[in-house]
From Swiss-Prot:
The keyword Zinc-finger applies. This is Acetyl-coenzyme A carboxylase carboxyl transferase subunit beta. Signal peptide: none annotated. Binds 1 zinc ion per subunit. Component of the acetyl coenzyme A carboxylase (ACC) complex. Biotin carboxylase (BC) catalyzes the carboxylation of biotin on its carrier protein (BCCP) and then the CO(2) group is transferred by the transcarboxylase to acetyl-CoA to form malonyl-CoA. It holds the Pfam family Carboxyl_trans. InterPro entries: AcCoA_carboxyl_beta, Acetyl_CoA_COase_Trfase_b_su, ClpP/crotonase-like_dom_sf, COA_CT_N, Znf-ACC. One of its GO terms (biological process) is malonyl-CoA biosynthetic process.
Length: 296
């Protein structure tokens, strides 16, 4: 090897070595505008792209903790874990899928429920975790939802649920479909007793979740451009063999057609929910009267 080859080789090796020292996860590409973003900046911005304002998927536990007053969160039914009652197997065993999802997310299932305060108002909050098997709804999700709703009823406080789900969990078959009726029944009980329920639909909210609890809020809110519907647009197009309208099943389309009540930016969600909770429970607003956005 000549002296110049040795220098060039050493330079290339040094360059390659320096590249390999960049820790994984430092940069994230926006799924909308494809800009490369600094992950820490994106985290500070609550997973909203600072370039195009695209609302990326948001970790369920982080979402709830950022909503509640610091130090006020108490988890509800944290001990519940899914069971493979049917010994279900598709390409993989269900129990193996559960183990992999639990290892990946650090959560026991696709749903987290908490009690805490929002601007010192006691509330119950819940969120689907899309990273856990697509946020699918099984028996544990249904059970935790019911426990959270019962807590809200017992304390006579608002219940807020963030949806991000592909629908019912196929590996639990009929047990998962039963959760649609189970969650709808407890919400009917809440409505009968005057308990406020606010549903926040995030991207995506589909299948059995959209056909049950997600659309049963006293107020239904969506994040911008969230995909909301029963079947996905590709499935519908293949079935009807027609091109769907522009923006079909997106939050803006649903708002225009009266299926949801409002669209709220993630950065404004906490204050908006606080105003709504105060209004719905006849409590003093946590803000100045002039800042209220709810019309009489």
């Amino acid at each position: 090897m000549s002296w110049i080859e040795r220098i060039l080789g050493r330079t290339a090796s040094s360059s390659s070595s320096s590249k390999s020292k960049v820790p994984e996860g430092v940069w994230t590409k926006c799924t909308n505008c494809e800009q490369v973003l600094y992950s820490e900046e994106l985290k500070r911005n609550m997973q909203v792209c600072p370039k195009c304002d695209h609302h990326m998927r948001f970790d369920a536990r982080t979402r709830l903790l950022s909503l509640l007053d610091q130090g006020s969160a108490e988890e509800i039914a944290a001990n519940l874990e899914p069971q493979d009652i049917l010994k279900f197997k598709d390409l993989k065993k269900y129990k193996d899928r559960l183990t992999a999802a639990q290892k990946q997310t650090g959560e026991k299932d696709a749903f987290i429920t908490m009690f805490g305060t929002l601007y010192e108002m006691p509330i119950v909050v819940a969120s689907f975790n899309f990273e856990f098997m697509g946020g699918s709804m099984g028996a544990v999700v249904g059970a935790k939802f019911v426990r959270a709703a019962e807590k809200a009823l017992a304390e006579n406080i608002p219940f807020i649920c963030f949806s991000a789900s592909g629908g019912a969990r196929m590996q639990e078959a009929l047990f998962s479909l039963m959760q649609m009726a189970k969650t709808s029944a407890i919400l009917a009980k809440m409505r009968e007793k005057g308990g406020p329920f606010i549903s926040v639909l995030t991207d995506p909210t589909l299948g059995g979740v959209s056909a049950s609890l997600a659309m049963l809020g006293d107020i239904n809110i969506a994040e911008p451009k969230s995909l909301i519907g029963f079947a996905g647009p590709r499935v519908i197009e293949q079935t009807v063999r027609e091109k769907l309208p522009e923006g079909f099943q997106r939050a803006e389309f649903l708002l225009e057609h009266g299926a949801i009540d409002m669209i709220v930016q993630r950065k404004d969600m906490r204050d908006t929910l606080a105003r709504l909770c105060a209004k719905m429970t006849n409590q003093p607003s946590p803000f100045k009267v002039g800042e209220l956005i709810i019309e009489e």
